[in-house]
Regions:
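The alpha/beta-hydrolase serine catalytic core
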Residues: 5, 124-233, 237-257
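Short beta-strand element of the alpha/beta-hydrolase
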Residues: 28-36
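Primarily recognizes the serine-hydrolase "nucleophile elbow" in alpha/beta-hydrolase
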Residues: 89-153
């Protein structure tokens, strides 16, 4: 399939949700896109990745988390565990070695996906070819949300279950739920060593106001067993969607494809 979304069901019973997936058949290693919080698979970077795969005959997989884009479900029902489960289910539809490309929250999803994959199949059978993390935001619910909230906002979340956070990227507010925060604590990765068994490149804008560049530096201190390259882009923002940013991302991926 290519261009048209197909749907897979993730979860059972009341937890079942329809996840939209767009796959492009092609050679390996495949390119597996993991988007960010409130982003979808039709964003600038995701479409550039799809064009790159098309031009080089590579397999490309994109999908929307539940409550995002073309997928079913309500955004406010989303948690890190649910979205990670969906990423794993979509990954299981792919074949052969894959390059995981995770943007913002997608960077956290990529790390959780890799951990689950390695736990399931072991390092020798791993299909993780490489990883590109763009402004990665592991543990963001705790480190970049909860830690920065005022006592008033924290109390609002604990008492009402939700806080509406203005977004600098859209007119719609982000719904920050108590479930999102509490579930996030079950998925924290920055308190331990992370071993992926594949090369990792991190692209991070120094002018990023959503995920501070020091957050990416901190991530590297937990990836000491892998070949990790951190590229700081002095004038780059959080999105890293300018033509020169896209060019840099694709150049990195091209080097990984070989």
């Amino acid at each position: 399939m290519s261009g048209t979304a197909e749907r897979i069901t993730v979860g059972v019973g009341a937890a079942a949700r329809e996840i939209a997936v767009i796959g492009r058949a092609g050679a390996g290693p495949g390119l597996f896109w993991l988007g960010g919080f409130r982003s979808d698979m039709a964003g600038t970077k995701a479409l550039a990745l799809d064009d790159f795969g098309r031009d080089r005959g590579l397999a490309v997989t994109r999908f929307d988390y539940s409550g995002h884009g073309l997928s079913g479900g309500r955004f406010e029902d989303g948690t890190i565990s649910r979205w990670a489960e969906e990423a794993q289910a979509v990954f299981d539809t792919t074949e052969g070695p894959q390059i995981l490309i995770g943007s913002s929250m997608g960077g956290w999803m990529a790390l959780l996906l890799a951990r689950a994959h390695l736990a399931a199949v072991g390092r020798d059978a791993s299909r993780l070819h490489a990883m590109v993390l763009i402004a990665p935001a592991p543990d963001f619910t705790e480190e970049l949300m909860w830690a920065g909230f005022s006592d008033e906002i924290r109390r609002e979340i604990l008492e009402t279950g939700v806080h509406r956070e203005p977004s600098e990227y859209s007119d719609e507010s982000h719904l920050i739920t108590r479930a999102l925060i509490e579930d996030g604590r079950k998925n924290l990765v920055l308190g331990q060593e992370i071993e992926l068994g594949c090369p990792v490149v991190i692209l991070q804008g120094v002018m990023d106001t959503s995920v501070p560049w020091r957050h990416a530096v901190r991530l590297t201190t937990h990836l000491t067993r892998d070949d990790v390259t951190l590229s700081l882009i002095p004038d780059g923002d959080h999105r890293l969607s300018r033509p020169q940013d896209i060019e840099k991302m694709l150049k990195v991926i091209e080097g990984m494809v070989g």
